[in-house]
Amino acid sequence: MFQNKEQTESILVWEKIVSIFSIPSQNEILNFKQKSPNNIDNNLKQLFNFVKLYKLESLVLDWYFESIKKYFKSTLSNEFWKFFNNVNLAELDSSTTSGRQLKFINHQFALSINLLHKVFSFFKSNLFLFYELLFKKESYNFNFLIKKLQDLLITNIMHTTNQQTKYFNTILFMFFERDFISFTKSFYHSKKQILKDEEENNNNSKDLEFNDQQQEEEEEEEENEEESKSYIIMEMSFEDSITDINIKEDSFMDLCKKLQDLNFIVISEEIFTQILFKKVFEYIETRCKGVFEKSFLKSILEWADQVIFKWLAMILLSSTTTTKINNYNDIINNNDDDNDDDDDDENKENSLKIFNQWKKRLEFSIYENYSQQRISELFDMIVQYPDSLPSLEDLSICFQKIPIEKTMITNLKRVLHNRLLHPGANTSDIITQYISTIHAMDIIDPSGMVMEKVGKPIREYLSQREDTIRCIISSFTEESNEIYQELCNYDPQDNGGDDDSNNSLLAFGNCDLYVDEGDNFSSIDDFKFWIPNKIDGSSTTISIGNAKANNNNKKKKKKDTISHLVNIYDGIDLFINEYRSMLSDRLLSVVDFDLDKEIKNIELLKLRFGDSVLFNCEIMIKDMVDSKRLNLQIKNSQGVNNNNNNNNNNNNELKEFETLILSQLFWPTLKGDEFKYPKSIEKKMQIYSKEYERIKTPRQLIWKQHLGLVDLDLEIGNNIQSFQVSPIHATLIMLFESDDGDDDDEKELTLEYLSKQLEISKDLVKKKLIFWLNNQIIKETSHETYKINNKEKEEQKQRQQQIENDDQDESSSDDDDDDNNIVVEEEEEEKSTSAKEKEEQMRVVESFIIGMLINFKTLPLERIHSMLTMFNSELYTSTIHELKAFLSKLVNEEKIELVGNDFKIKK
């Protein structure tokens, strides 16, 4: 009997609950006003007590959620999508939708969210009533009920079908994108107004300094206007959105609060990602692309702080504040002491946590997009160094913030291979860009790890070029070169104070170690315990046994530019040998024995590389100094001997005869073709040798006849020409000098005669004659027969011949003479014009010829002709005979020289 009564009462309670909490009509829900929890009717409390008594809590809650689900699916979903009946959702696209249509869609979206929020608030209020009367004392989490309600709403409204999900995401994307654009324009509008006010204040001042500042602000204003234009993607103006910025932001924040309550913000993460990342990319590309002279990273972060993060705070932190968001940091640092609600504190903490996560993601995106933009232009930044220094410093900050090392190395190596490391680039240009790369990488990554990887293909490529060492050594000795300045500024004290006379070559075990100027090893033991730098460039120390490396004795390892250049060949031996060879060439061409520059260069190199490696070079300089002194001594001695012997004929034998005495073991091998000197020169050489043997007994001289310089003054007719030539060229032209007082230009010599007199081959004589032929000193009268080219006498003969011809043609009519003269003049003008055009055409091709000879060292005539025809067919249309004539002119201009059958750059 009792059991039946209990069942009956429980049924009555259930029916009462169903009647009270059944889903009302749409109007009743929308007009619902939430009551305070303290004003709950006593009858309702008693009803819920019976629910608890009969343990119907779970049953009631499940029933209510099921009722909500049915309502959402059958009624609310239809009501929501009715707002978009006039919108073609299937073709909805933010990029093609007009501003008016977009504004209508956003208005309808706001109305639909208001509807959902009112319905949600109604059910939330009832769930709160259930929680207060049924579950509060059981430590039941009210947030669990809200989360379940939110999930039901999302599932049954937006995610009923895949198509509805797509439509809703599109609408949500368009809503947030349009608001962001509007918010950005509002920001620039406000900023423009601030700049305008500052400009008005500046106009009141007549100070020149203020005028300069005003000009800078005007430039900044123009720049901001350009930035603002980049965001006006859609057909809308500032007035198209809510005119009053404050009202607009308040409306947006109110809608965002509702979206937060409905949990739509959380599910919109992908939409935020698309919008914000897209805007970050567009902003960086618009402002920074191709501009390297300014630093942009700081201004980009400030823009993100004032625009991106503030807009994001309006969305994510709208539920944590009731005031207008001017600075999101104020919300983060604000502690609502008056708020004792633990749930609100928890919600605020969660919102701040989500916001900070987003902030970090966006900051990472800024660094990533900026670094990607700069890495894609890194080669151009290197080419424009040091003008690109601000951009390189920005990239250095990105390098410290995010992992871009691998991307940067891969991209730069690829670009270097495509744009720099190819046969068309001059070696000097490659070295210049290599040096700029060293400086740029030193700014980005001071540890040097990136440069080590990026520089490897450059070093390998340069090591394969024959003129690399010569180009580098030239940069060491040219005062205008950056490397020379670095060499001058080198401080030997930075080497760590080794005892081996600052020698940078240390012996450790069986290997040679090259110590850079940045290393500071107080002893060889310090080196044993050194370990490589970390990615941030910091150094560490380790202990082995009882020995400990002292971190205080270590400095940050850093290779200078010279170290990188030397490491192309993994040592300095090749460089020193090449320098010795180049020094030999320069010293052998010295006439006045002015060695100050060479002595300075050697001293600088000794400081950098040590004394021992430059010992031979010092001996070479010493030979020059000793030769100058010995020449003076021998001349004075010879003059005294002649005066004592009353021999006036030999008094001036050695007056213009200078000899350079070389220590054969210390100079590079000096090879050349020996020949027979004229007797007058041999006589001077014998006199000099005897005096030398007398002074330097028991030493003897071994003459290098092919070396040296001869100053010649050639008098041909009434013209005197001066030349500085090699001994063999001087000897060759002296053979044309008459012995019996006759005119030199009447003397004809055959190739065979010249070969016998010089005691060299005919081919070599032919080769040496080219110089005098190109300078028009001699001419070939017949096959392998030559004579002095006296132009005055030839012109005189031609004039005499012309007079004789004119006398013979006096019987011809004047009209015919005039016609013939006109024809001849026209033909000469045509030939002259054609020759000039051909000359100009060949001069254009000259740079290509010089470039090919620099890269390939030596090339025969046929190879040069084929390469020009293949690669410059539009510019080069000459025959091989015309090319040969032009190359002869370049030889005459001493730009190139002919060695055998090959042309090469004249050294």
Curated annotation (Swiss-Prot):
Self-association and partners: The APC/C is composed of at least 13 subunits that stay tightly associated throughout the cell cycle: anapc1, anapc2, anapc3, anapc4, anapc5, anapc6, anapc7, anapc8, anapc10, anapc11, cdc20, cdc26 and cdh1.
Comp. bias intervals (Acidic residues): 214-226, 804-830
Domain of life assignment: Eukaryota
Family listed: Belongs to the cullin family.
Keywords: Cell cycle, Cell division, Mitosis, Nucleus, Ubl conjugation pathway
Name of the gene this protein is made from: anapc2
InterPro entries recorded: APC2-like, APC2_C, Cullin_homology, Cullin_homology_sf, Cullin_N, WH-like_DNA-bd_sf, WH_DNA-bd_sf
Region of interest (Disordered), ranges: 203-228, 790-838
Annotated GO biological process: anaphase-promoting complex-dependent catabolic process; cell division; metaphase/anaphase transition of mitotic cell cycle; protein K11-linked ubiquitination; protein ubiquitination
Cell compartment(s), UniProt: Nucleus
Organism: Dictyostelium discoideum (Social amoeba)
Molecular-function GO terms, alphabetical: ubiquitin protein ligase binding
Gene3D superfamilies recorded: Cullin Repeats (1.20.1310.10), Cullin, Chain C, Domain 2 (3.30.230.130), Winged helix-like DNA-binding domain superfamily/Winged helix DNA-binding domain (1.10.10.10)
Keyword Repeat carried by entry: no
Protein name: Anaphase-promoting complex subunit 2
CC annotations in GO: anaphase-promoting complex; cytosol; nucleus
Known role: Component of the anaphase promoting complex/cyclosome (APC/C), a cell cycle-regulated E3 ubiquitin-protein ligase complex that controls progression through mitosis and the G1 phase of the cell cycle.
